């Protein structure tokens, strides 16, 4: 099994959106052997469900997110791929675990966009724009993981 974690600050907007989208895309593409998680580097929202804006956008696109609650990224976490939403999250992850073993990337490294960071819709309220960024990056990320981890599609 391959473990993938999406990480943002509070784990209520961007990373749970990415977790839900990634899970759905893996199902759509009939790819098994991948566990998908989301975590936050801040403690403010622990145990809370995704933000209402994240829930709304996922519901509009018929992407399930049942049972998701905010969890903290911890030094003991062991993931094969850690996908941060922005440079601040990369820095926080490296501070939490300086000896991180998993492969650490920013999500937009897998996009064709000029931006390098996914903006936090908690502050911008642009959940649709963030959805588009995440959705457009997930298939390229899946392609990378399938090749890198020698997984089979279909």
From Swiss-Prot:
One of its GO terms (molecular function) is protein tyrosine phosphatase activity. The active site is at residues 8, 14, 120. Keywords: Hydrolase, Protein phosphatase. Its EC number is 3.1.3.48. Coiled coil: none annotated. It catalyses: O-phospho-L-tyrosyl-[protein] + H2O = L-tyrosyl-[protein] + phosphate. The keyword Hydrolase applies. Belongs to the low molecular weight phosphotyrosine protein phosphatase family. This is Low molecular weight protein-tyrosine-phosphatase PtpA.
